[in-house]
Design a protein with these regions (language model features):
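Extracellular/periplasmic carbohydrate-active domains that bind, remodel
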Residues: 1-221
Length: 221
């Protein structure tokens, strides 16, 4: 869906996409959206897939400057199995791509003005997912302070960890620490819903929240 000038010129999102019965192996992400997504990415269904030895399962990347048409919404994973995936679910709104990617404006954890350059991440939904032998963490969700991720839903999702895994940085953004066998980490998210979610063998809390407005289904740590 392109960078901001392409999104403004063509107004053409990537949408109504079905990915099913696929094997993804040995890459940075099983299914990736962004970071060049100024036209938007919407209504994506990933089902009946196997992801093996990838750094991440779902990988969403965006950043300030991608534009108000850069909407990522209605991304659904269901009936998916993962084996030896470093971080099964990653949504990163502070991706440090492009020559200015490490600047204070892109990476600031302080609220910036919401303007024509501000992207939006809406609903990201995971149902019936088995992630075995995870490495870094179960999930890493990093929104923008001024435009948090709207809603993360996990239902019938189960994680186990690889005790022999090595630490990994789950999201490519300044200040993101290397993780090992962590649970779900969420920062700048409006709403998290978890139903029948298990995390087995993690270090620390199952859910580690910072600037998350509402949590349903698990006691916020």
């Amino acid at each position: 869906a392109g960078k901001i000038y392409m999104g403004r010129t063509y107004h053409t999102p990537c949408e109504d996409i079905q990915i099913s019965h696929c094997l993804m192996e040995n890459g940075h992400g099983g299914v990736t959206a962004g970071s060049e997504m100024a036209g938007g990415v919407k209504h994506v269904r990933v089902s009946d897939c196997l992801m093996r030895n990838t750094d991440r399962g779902l990988r969403v990347k965006t950043r300030r400057g991608r534009g108000k048409d850069g909407v990522i919404d209605d991304i659904v994973f269901e009936h998916v199995k993962m084996e030896h995936v470093g971080a099964p679910f990653v949504v990163n709104c502070l991706y440090f791509c492009d020559p200015d990617g490490h600047t204070d404006w892109v990476q600031s954890r302080e609220k910036q003005p919401v303007n024509d350059g501000t992207p939006y991440v809406g609903n990201v939904i995971f149902r019936d997912v088995e992630a075995e032998h995870c490495g870094a963490c179960a999930g890493y969700f990093l929104g923008l302070p001024e435009q948090p991720i709207e809603h993360v839903v996990m239902e019938d999702v189960h994680f186990t960890f690889d005790s022999k895994a090595k630490p990994m940085q789950p999201a490519m953004a300044e200040g993101v620490e290397e993780c090992l066998n962590r649970g779900v980490i969420a920062k700048f998210v409006n709403h998290i819903t978890m139903k029948n979610v298990t995390v087995t063998g993690q270090q620390g809390d199952m859910l580690d929240c910072e600037q998350v407005a509402h949590v349903e289904g698990v006691e916020q740590q």
